[in-house]
């Protein structure tokens, strides 16, 4: 028997590297400190997708700190995405080929890296909205990620 103040780990699938479904997405557990990476949406039929700041899994809340490479690759239905405020990393090719994606809102002020070709093939009139205190830094961070010059980054 496990004391009340400790979590039982026997038979638990909540191990680092395991994938879990929550809401409209699939998440991979990335750390023992209750962090996950958003892997991909459960289906690619949605026109709007919100990558949340946190998700509820079987043993509690987990912070969503990254978006996996190719998460929305070639998703032609997607028009709008919101990225939660705990995300620090956006993987390579995340929105690659999402040609109808016209609006990306980044709520996170913690973003440190954006992978190669993350924005390749998004709509040429896409607007990327970022926190106003991070406008200059994020313009640099999002530079040359495959998007057309007509893609706007605003606050």
Residue ranges and their predicted role:
Residues 21-42, 140-146:
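GGW-centered surface loops in extracellular recognition modules
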Residues 13-14, 70, 102:
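Short intrinsically disordered, low-complexity segments
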Residues 7-8, 20-21, 80, 148:
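Intrinsic disorder/low-complexity segments enriched in polar/small residues
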Residues 1-18:
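Ser/Thr/Gly/Pro-rich low-complexity, disordered linker/stalk segments of secreted
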Residues 96, 117-121, 139-145:
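A structural signal for leucine-rich repeat
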Residues 69-71, 91-94, 116-118:
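Consensus positions within tandem repeat domains that build extended binding/scaffold surfaces
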Residues 2, 26, 31-32, 44-66, ...:
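Structural signature of tandem-repeat unit edges
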């Amino acid at each position: 028997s496990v004391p009340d103040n400790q979590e039982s780990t026997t038979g638990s699938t909540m191990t680092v590297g395991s994938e879990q479904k929550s809401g409209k997405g699939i998440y991979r557990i990335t750390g023992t400190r209750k962090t996950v990476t958003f892997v991909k949406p459960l289906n690619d039929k949605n026109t709007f997708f919100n990558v949340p700041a946190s998700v509820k899994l079987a043993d509690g809340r987990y912070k969503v700190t990254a978006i996996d490479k190719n998460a929305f690759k070639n998703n032609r239905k997607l028009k709008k995405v919101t990225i939660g405020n705990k995300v620090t990393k956006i993987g390579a090719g995340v929105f690659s080929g999402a040609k109808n994606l016209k609006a990306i809102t980044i709520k996170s002020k913690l973003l440190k890296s954006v992978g190669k070709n993350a924005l390749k093939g998004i709509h040429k009139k896409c607007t990327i909205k970022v926190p106003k205190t991070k406008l200059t830094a994020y313009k640099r961070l999002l530079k040359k990620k495959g998007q057309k010059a007509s893609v706007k980054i605003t606050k």
